Amino acid sequence: DFQEKNENRPVIPVYIGIHTFHDTESRTTVIYDWRAPISSMFYDHELGEASYQSPSGEINGEISLKRQYRIQAGKMEFMIESALTVHDDILQKELSANADDKMKNIVATIQREQNRIIRNEEARTLIIQGVAGSGKTSIALHRIAYLLYTFQGSLSSNDILIISPNKVFADYISNVLPELGEETVPETSMEQILSEVLNHKYKYFSFFEQVNELLTKPTPDFIKRIEYKSSFDFIASLDRFILYIENHYFRAEDVKLTKHITVPAEFIEEQFPRFNRYPMRQRFEAMTDYILDMMKVQYAFTVTTAERNFLKKEIKRMFAGNNDLQVYKDFFAWMGKPELFKMRKNRILEYADIAPLAYLHIALKGGTKNYVKHLLVDEMQDYSPIQYKVMQKLFPCRKTVLGDTSQSVNPYGSSTADMIQKALIMGEIMKLCKSYRSTCEITEFAQQIRTNTELEPVARHGKKPQVLQFDNEKEELSAIKNLIVTHQASAYKSLGIVCKTETQACEMAEKLQIPDIHFLSNQSSAFVQGIVITSAHMAKGLEFDEVIIPQVDDKNYHSEIDRSMLYVAVTRAMHRLTLTYSGTKHTPFI
C-alpha cells in the first residue's frame, strides 16, 4: 500500500506480478508488471518513506503495508505480511525447495542489490562479479527482460545475443525469458563466433579439449603459450605488428594496363595510406576506382571491365597480408618468438591461437556485427583479454558481462573483472557477494578449498559435507551406489555425480551400471533432471539438490586447475554434499 506525498492523495494498493493486467472498462491497471517503475519500491524499500522514478520525475511517498502471496492453480498457497521479513521468509521457502531441470524466474525474491543491477540503464558495459550461487545468471536474464520492457520499440529479442559456455547451459536457462513474457534470445558460443570470423577455415582444439589437456597431460611449454597469449603484453605486440603490416606489407609495382598505358608503382604506393579509413584488405576496390578515375581525368581513358578487374587483382597481389595464418606466423617471427606458435598434428591449431588469429583478420578485413544491440556474456572468467578485444571489435554495442573469478576452469588464460574492464576500455563493475545456493555448511567447506573474503552466505543450515575414505576403488564404488539408493528414497529430485574430467565421468557411469543415470558430455545439448553424472567443467552454472564427488585423493586433485575443478564441483550442491576417495590420502585442498 502506497500513499504519495500529498495530503489529498489516497492510499492505493499496488499489486505486482509477472505481467501487467489492465482493466479496459475502468481503464486502470489492476496488476503492475514487476518491471514497471512503481514496482521498484517493493524491492528497494521497507515500510516507511519510499520513492520511485516515473517518466515524469521522482515520486515520493510512504509504504504502509507489504504483503506477498503465492497463488497456484487458483488456490492461495500462502500470504505473508510483515514489515521486514517478507523477502526473507519467501526467500527461505525458495532456497529450501528442490532444484529443477530448468532455471526459474526469481521475480518473487529479487533482492535489493540484485534489483540495482537489473534496472541499471546508465552503464554501457556492466561487469557483474558474482560469487558462486549469487544468482548472477538469473539476474542477467531478468536484466535483459527489464531492458526489453523498458525499451520496447527500440530493442527486441532479436537485437540481443547471449554468449554461453555450452549447449547444456543454454538449454538450462532457456525457460527464464519465456516465463517473464519475452521471446527467447539468440544464443551462441565463443567458438562459433571465432569460427565465423575466420570463415570456418581452420581446424582447432576446442576450449573443452584445451582444459582436458591441462587436466591430464599439461606441459610447461603448453602452459607458457596459453599464459602469454592471455596477456596484455601480447595484445600490445599484436597491435604494433598490425601497424607494421600497414607500413611494410604493401609493395607497389608498375602495372602495364594496356600496350600504351602503365600505372606507375609510385602512384599506386601513394594510394594505400590514402584509404586508411578502410581495413587493409578492403582498400583494393577503392584504390582501383580512384586510380582509374585519375587516369580518366588525365588521359581521357576509359577501361574495360576486364582491365579494371586485372588492375584490382594486381593491386591485391602487391599486399603480402592476404593469408591470415601466414601473417600470424610472421607475427611470431617478427617478435623473435617463433616457439610460441605451435600447430598440432594434421595442422590443428591450439585454442589459444584462434582469438588472436580472428583479431588479426578483423584488423585486416573488418567485420563489425551492428545488428546486435546488447551482448550478454556469461562465465566471463573463462575468456582471455584477447577474446574480449575480439568481442569489442565485433560488437560495438552495450554489454552485460558476468561471472566469478573463483570459478575459472581456464586458470592460465582467465580474466578478472578489472582485466575485462581494461580490455573493453570501459565498464562499470558491480558485485554480488551473497551466496544463496548452498547451505552454510557447504559454503564453509567450499571456502576451505578456495577462500573468497567477499562471499556472504545466506543463513540456511543443513548437514555437514561428508568426506568418506575407502581401502580400495571397489569399496568406494559400492558406497557411491548406496548413496544413490539413499538419494532415490529421499525427497530430493536431483543428484549430480561430478568427476574431475569427462573421461573419469564416462568410466564412472560404466562402472555404476545403474538405470536412469544421465551422462552429460560436452556433446550433450540438454540438461535433464534426476541423476546426472558429468565433469566439473560441464557442471559449471548448474545446481543439484545433492552432489557426490568421487576420487578426491591426492593424486587426482593436486594442481591449481584441479583446485578450480574441485571448487566448481563443491559449489554445485544446494542441500547435501559427499566426497569419496580410496587410498590413504585425500586431496590437500580439503
What are the residue ranges of the model-derived segments?
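N-terminal accessory nucleic-acid engagement/regulatory domains that precede
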Residues: 1-93
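Pre-Walker A adenine-sensing motif
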Residues: 108-120
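Pre-Walker A (Motif I) flank of P-loop NTPase domains
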Residues: 122-126
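Hydrophobic anchor at the beta1->P-loop junction of P-loop NTPases
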Residues: 128-130
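Walker A (P-loop) phosphate-binding loop of P-loop NTPases
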Residues: 133
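Conserved lysine of the Walker
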Residues: 136-137
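Alpha-helical nucleic-acid-binding subdomain
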Residues: 148-376, 382-390, 398
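Conserved helicase motor core of SF1/SF2 NTP-dependent helicases
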Residues: 153-154, 158, 167-183, 188-195, ...
